[in-house]
């Protein structure tokens, strides 16, 4: 919200393509502060990059925003291709990286992203309730220009100018949640010890293993095959199974997976592979999921679960 309210006004128009719940939330936030062209794709389907570029060719957009990793549907957008498209048309590229930063390659400088938003509680395995924004110099200058022109949105606590001024002194405009910041700092120390590259690889190993395992067992995956996420896998339930399975998985097997959002509730489940989850824990979790499906009468072949994660 701070990124959108500070760097836009009602004279601006932004393009927001979406293919899931959290992208739609980005579009809704943008509508509070500026004009929005919402390209609403089917959940789990890849963006039509040709359509996105056709829109940009109209020359009426100042920015394009995406939810980089859409965890509601288990799809990761082709951020690099979209970034190149934005550069060709002189449009700012803004990235919701809440569930991608720390869990997969994100390159703000290479992609010339104007702003990247991230949350602590996802791929960096920090506490919930704290977030960070990275902005480039162009974004800072544009925010200042909007303020000088008198077009700024009246959002006192979301004013980026105040944050930038205090940031020069390594301070915040108001008292921060110090305990959360310290918790996040500790989590980032763990990430530093592991290294970005090693964490990306571990998340990819787990996600690929989950995808291959459940596909071999006859399950269908929601997201398009070319862009499936390495931080979460969305798996459709077999016929006759619903969220009662998740309840049983939690109560009998002490294992939790998340359900679906909105119109997909009761039709699929999602397996996370982000943060500090070890591969061994994922293997055991998959064994328990398979056992629970068998409890519900689903006929599944015998498989060597660990072999999918080697």
Where do the model's predicted regions map?
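Conserved PLP-anchoring active-site segment centered on the Schiff-base-forming lysine
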Residues: 10-24
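Active-site phosphate-binding strand-loop segment of PLP-dependent enzymes
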Residues: 47-102, 115
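Active-site C-terminal subdomain of aminotransferase-like
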Residues: 121-212, 216
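PLP-dependent enzyme catalytic core of the Aspartate aminotransferase-like
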Residues: 263, 267-310
């Amino acid at each position: 919200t701070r990124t959108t309210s500070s760097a836009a006004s009602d004279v601006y128009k932004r393009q927001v393509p979406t293919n899931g719940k959290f992208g739609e939330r980005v579009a809704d936030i943008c509508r509070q502060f500026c004009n929005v062209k919402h390209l609403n794709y089917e959940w789990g389907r890849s963006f039509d990059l040709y359509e996105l570029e056709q829109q940009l060719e109209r020359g009426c957009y100042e920015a394009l925003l995406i939810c980089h990793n859409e965890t509601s549907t288990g799809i990761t957008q082709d951020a690099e291709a979209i970034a190149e498209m934005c550069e060709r048309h002189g449009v700012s590229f803004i990235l919701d990286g809440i569930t991608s930063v720390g869990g997969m390659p994100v390159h703000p400088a290479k992609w010339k992203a104007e702003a990247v938003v991230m949350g602590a509680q996802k791929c960096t395995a920090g506490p919930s309730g704290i977030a960070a924004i990275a902005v480039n110099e162009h974004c800072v200058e544009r925010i200042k220009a909007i303020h000088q022109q008198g077009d700024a949105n009246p959002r006192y606590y979301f004013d980026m100018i105040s944050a930038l001024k205090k940031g020069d002194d390594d301070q915040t405009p108001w008292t921060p949640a110090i305990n959360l910041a310290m918790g996040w700092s500790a989590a980032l120390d763990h990430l530093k010890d592991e290294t970005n590259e090693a964490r990306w690889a571990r998340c990819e190993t787990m996600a690929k293993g989950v995808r291959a395992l459940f596909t071999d067992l006859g399950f269908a995956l929601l997201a398009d095959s070319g862009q499936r996420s390495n931080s979460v896998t969305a798996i459709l339930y077999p016929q006759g199974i619903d969220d009662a399975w998740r309840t049983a998985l939690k109560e009998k097997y002490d294992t939790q997976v998340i359900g679906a959002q909105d119109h997909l509730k009761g039709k699929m489940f999602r397996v996370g592979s982000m943060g500090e989850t070890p591969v061994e824990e994922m293997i055991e979790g998959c064994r328990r999921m398979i056992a629970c499906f068998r409890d519900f009468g689903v006929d599944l072949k015998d498989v060597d679960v660990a072999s999918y994660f080697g």
